[in-house]
Regions:
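Flexible, polar/low-complexity N-terminal or interdomain linker segments that lie immediately upstream
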Residues: 1-53, 122-129
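Catalytic cysteine-centered active loop of the rhodanese-like fold, especially the PTP/DSP P-loop
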Residues: 58-116
């Protein structure tokens, strides 16, 4: 973890490489959306992205990440999301400390996902198939 912390400089945060938007992330070829909300949150409002075939979604609550880290693919671009960004930031740093390379935080959390899934944006996804 010390190595990860030592890389989090002003330049790192200033360039914004640690975060992405849903629009950018949903357009990549091979993505993995890691939902780190509590199980109860995910059961109440699930994130499925069934029409975004290039993105795999999985809910692994923050407190289960250490025991379930083997379920997170290292060969995909990973975006971590939660209802805000606090848990995402914690899991982001943890994954970096475990050697994951292609990890970022989904900027704005769940609210930006719902905005990115409005009817016009879903229609564009469907028409691009």
């Amino acid at each position: 973890m010390e190595h990860v912390l030592s890389t989090l400089s002003l330049e790192f945060f200033g360039k914004g490489k640690h975060k992405t938007t849903p629009e950018i992330f949903f357009a990549i070829e091979n993505g993995f959306l890691l939902d780190v909300r509590a199980r109860e949150e995910a059961e109440s409002i699930a994130i499925k992205l069934d029409h975004h075939r290039n993105i795999e979604c999985k809910n692994i609550p923050t407190d289960e990440i250490p025991d379930r880290i083997h379920e997170i693919p290292q060969d995909k671009s990973i975006a971590v999301c939660c209802s805000g960004m606090a848990r995402s930031a914690i899991v982001y740093a943890y994954l970096l400390s475990k050697g994951f390379k292609n990890v970022c935080i989904l900027e704005g959390g769940y609210a930006t996902i719902t905005d990115a899934l409005k009817p016009g944006k879903i229609l564009k996804v469907l028409q691009s198939k």
